[in-house]
């Protein structure tokens, strides 16, 4: 008994199989990251310095204005295998209601504080608490950046960590960390990005990246 094969169909199927394997092998992991925090915390300066760290065109740090709306940048990491799409969203009180619109699509959150401004501790604490208790970001890695460490009048990093831990102690288990940085000088900026990439990849089952 002779079995006839549809050679045309077999070749077509093989082509799509090979194409799918090729695309899967060569696709990159894309993660959306929110950069949040009060106004004047240094969010945009952090973003621009991060771009500069990875040899991307960036703005003059002396000409950065308060963000009204959002700034967006894509930064390749991990030998170009991972792409971070960073959303720097305005931190003025009237703009914070916009933050929730981004929660459902984010894979990680960077929360930036001005560690020299003791008068706004309660304000940024309340803002951070409102973020991490939201069901839309359950399980999402949270990285707090204690910015402006180049200044002599910064709070002790241990005091900032204590405040963060008091906020985070009642939420579901997730990766979180407090890092001291200076967005102006670049100290700690790359370390922050590297930490976040590792946590995003650990969290892939809960928040899968977009492959393309």
Language model regions located:
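TRAFAC-class small GTPase G-domain
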Residues: 2-212
């Amino acid at each position: 008994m002779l079995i006839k094969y549809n050679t045309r169909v077999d070749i077509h199927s093989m082509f799509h199989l090979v194409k799918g394997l090729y695309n899967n092998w060569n696709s990159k992991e894309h993660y959306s990251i929110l950069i949040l925090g009060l106004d004047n915390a240094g969010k945009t300066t952090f973003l621009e310095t991060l771009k500069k760290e990875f040899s991307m065109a960036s703005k003059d740090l002396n000409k950065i204005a308060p963000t009204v709306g959002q700034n967006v940048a894509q930064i390749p990491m991990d030998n170009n295998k991972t792409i971070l799409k960073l959303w720097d969203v305005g931190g003025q009180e009237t703009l914070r209601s916009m933050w929730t619109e981004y929660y459902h699509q984010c894979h990680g959150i960077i929360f930036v504080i001005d560690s020299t401004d003791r008068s706004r501790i309660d304000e940024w604490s309340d803002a951070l608490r409102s973020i991490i208790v939201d069901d839309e970001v359950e399980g999402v890695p949270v990285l707090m950046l204690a910015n402006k460490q180049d200044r002599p009048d910064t709070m002790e990093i241990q005091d900032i960590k204590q405040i963060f831990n008091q906020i985070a102690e009642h939420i579901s288990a997730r990766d979180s960390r407090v890092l001291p940085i200076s967005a102006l000088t670049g100290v700690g900026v790359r370390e922050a990005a590297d930490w976040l990439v590792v946590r995003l990849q650990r969290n892939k089952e809960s928040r899968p990246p977009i492959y393309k």
